[in-house]
Amino acid sequence: MHCPFCSATDTKVIDSRLVADGHQVRRRRECVQCHERYTTFEGAELVMPRVVKQDGSRQPFDEEKLRGGMLRAVEKRPVSMDQIEQSLTKIKSTLRATGEREVKSEMIGNLMMDQLVNLDKVAYIRFASVYRAFEDVSEFGEAIANLQK
C-alpha cells in the first residue's frame, strides 16, 4: 500500500485487529520512508445479486431501499436500530448464500417478512399489507389469524 503522506511504496503493519464483529480488519501502518502512521480498514468485497422485479426488469440490489422499507414498517414501534441492522444483515447473508447472480424481488419481500414477524408483529402486518396489497379488512384478519397460529 502506498503511503498517503509521501506516496512511498514501502509501508509496514504495526498492529492488526478484528473489528465490526470480525467482518473487518483494522491495521495501523507506518511508512518506512517518512515514518508517518495511519489506519486502514480491510473487508471482504461481497457482491450482492441483481434483483429481478415482477415486471421482469433488473436492477442492482439497493440496501437503502431495503432499510427504508423496514424503517417504515417499524416506525413508532419498540424496535432498536441494532435489531434492524441485524435483520438487514441476515437478509443480505441469505441472499448471498443463494449463490445466484439474480434473485426475484418476491424472495426479498418474503425474507423481509420473515425478519419482521420475529421483530414486531405490528410491523409485520404493516409491511405485509403493503407488500401483499391488502384490499379489505378480511385480508388483515387472515394475516393476523396466521400470526396467532
UniProtKB/Swiss-Prot annotation:
Indicate whether Phosphoprotein appears among the record's keywords. no
The cross-references to PANTHER family, in alphabetical order and at most eight, read: TRANSCRIPTIONAL REPRESSOR NRDR (PTHR30455:SF2)
What's this protein's name?
A: Transcriptional repressor NrdR
> What's the domain of life for this entry?
Bacteria
Q: Which organism is it from?
A: Shewanella piezotolerans (strain WP3 / JCM 13877)
Entry's Pfam families? ATP-cone (PF03477), Zn_ribbon_NrdR (PF22811)
Keyword DNA repair listed? The answer is no
Q: Which family does it belong to?
A: Belongs to the NrdR family.
Q: Which cofactor does it need?
A: Zn(2+)
What biological function has been recorded for the protein in this entry?
Negatively regulates transcription of bacterial ribonucleotide reductase nrd genes and operons by binding to NrdR-boxes.
The Gene Ontology biological process terms listed for this entry are: negative regulation of DNA-templated transcription
Please report the stretch or stretches of sequence annotated as the ATP-cone domain. Answer: 49-139
| GO terms, molecular function | ATP binding; DNA binding; zinc ion binding
Q: Where are the zinc fingers (unnamed)?
A: 3-34
Q: Which PROSITE patterns does the annotation name?
A: ATP_CONE
Co-factor remark: Binds 1 zinc ion.
> Keywords for this entry?
ATP-binding, DNA-binding, Metal-binding, Nucleotide-binding, Repressor, Transcription, Transcription regulation, Zinc, Zinc-finger
